[in-house]
Amino acid sequence: MKPIISPSILSADFAYLAKDIEMINRSEADWVHIDIMDGVFVPNISFGFPVLKYVAKLTSKPLDVHLMIVNPEKFIPEVKALGAHIMNVHYEACPHLHRVVQQIREAGMQPAVTINPATPITLLQDIIRDVYMVLVMSVNPGFG
């Protein structure tokens, strides 16, 4: 299995965002990782959908959108419309994870699931075959 490189733009300087995206476009990176935080599921707020739309216009790489938000299923159509290829939701934010994964796939994106550092990976045994990838956080979500 080939490792996938998906640099995050979480710590990018907005004044140089276009330049940073161009650098990623010229790199060997496979995807661009965009973290969207709502200040509810996680304590911080990050990019919103306008930034996702802007980055989608600039990049030649697939967009890996990581939603650290409550009720991510409400935003599936918007995330797809804004150009995401992979929609990554948190196990802890989705009481009906199977349904959310199915909705992401039906929208035409690759479903991915993230777990927090303290969440046992064994909790994913019933969903693992239904997702494109699993992201295991090495820090508590909301901090980069």
Predicted feature locations:
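Conserved N-terminal beta1-alpha1 strand-loop-helix module at the mouth
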Residues: 1-88, 93-96, 103-106, 110-111, ...
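Short gly/ser/thr-rich secondary-structure transition/capping motifs
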Residues: 114-118
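Glycine/threonine-rich flexible loop motifs
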Residues: 144
